[in-house]
Structures are given as structure tokens and as C-alpha cells.
Amino acid sequence: MVDAHTRKTLAAIPLLRVNAGPRSGDLWRARHKEELMSLITYVKNNKENDNDWFRLESNPEGTRWFGKCWIVVDMLKYEFDLEFDIPVAYPSTAPEIAIPELDGKTAKMYRGGKICLTDHFKPLWARNVPHFGIAHAMALGLGPWLAVEIPDLVSKGIVKHKETSS
């Protein structure tokens, strides 16, 4: 199910050890620290491989995340705001990543712009609890979703480049 490139990417993202969610007090703070270290490693690896495609930051508690993601299609950069909350049942439940400005533009999305990861990503996440974290959700969830959906939406004229649509 996972190709060689994806395996290589995954192998470079540190696995997490702390099994804690937002209501776990000190354990959550330890998990949040692990999440940040994993994300830093993933972003660093992406930059080294000329594959930089997102920025994320969180509130101080690490329960609300927001940032930007982008993809280049036909030599044009398409940039989107993204957001998600850490579910109470995290890490047993994967975060639901949302791109609000794309809400209603594709069938592979739920209300509020939450991207559909049910078929491919969620079973993989469930098999890897508590070792997968936010970096894994970006690498295995949002990244592939953007790579498939955005070029399709651009080709159909549903998503237009901001500079050329003015």
C-alpha cells in the first residue's frame, strides 16, 4: 500500500512514544514536545529535499494548530490556510485537517473544509497509535490529498491562481 518514497519519508520522521491527549496534563506536555520535535525533523528533511510545502504553529497548549500549505501546479504556487484541533481522544483519533477556503469545492471533503482521509489514512493511523503524530498526518494525509485534489480542482477551473484570477 505504501510506495518506496513514502516509506523513506516515514522512516525519516521520528515515531512518538508518549501516549497522551490534551486532557492528560503533564503527559500531554511531554507529547506536545515530542510532536514539535517530530515536526521540526520533518520540515528540516523536506527543506533538504527541496520539498518544503507547509508551515504550522499551535496555541500554547498545543490543542489548536493553524498555518499554511502550498502546492505548485503548472508552475503556479497555490497557497491555502489550514487548521485543525487535536481531538480529545488523541492519539487514538487522528486530527481532522481543514482547508476552509476549499469547503464545498470537492467531494473528498467534509463540512467546514475538513479533508477526507477515511479510506487510506485513518486505518494506517489506527495501526500505529501512539507512534504517529502530526508530522505523520501531514506526510500521509494532507500531502497526498493536496497532490491529488488540487491539480484536479485547477484543471476543472474550480480553484484559480490568486494572481491570475484578479
UniProtKB/Swiss-Prot annotation:
Biological process, per Gene Ontology: protein ufmylation; response to endoplasmic reticulum stress; reticulophagy
Active site: C116 (glycyl thioester intermediate)
CDD domains recorded: UBCc_UFC1
Xref: Pfam families: UFC1
Protein keywords: Ubl conjugation pathway
Metal-binding listed as a keyword: no
Gene3D superfamilies: Ubiquitin Conjugating Enzyme (3.10.110.10)
Entry coiled-coil feature ranges: none
Keyword Phosphoprotein appears in the UniProt entry: no
GO molecular function, a single term: UFM1 conjugating enzyme activity
InterPro entries, per the entry: UBQ-conjugating_enzyme/RWD (IPR016135), Ufc1 (IPR014806)
Family to which the UniProt record says this protein belongs: Belongs to the ubiquitin-conjugating enzyme family. UFC1 subfamily.
Biological role: E2-like enzyme which forms an intermediate with UFM1 via a thioester linkage.
Protein name: Ubiquitin-fold modifier-conjugating enzyme 1
Annotated source species: Monosiga brevicollis (Choanoflagellate)
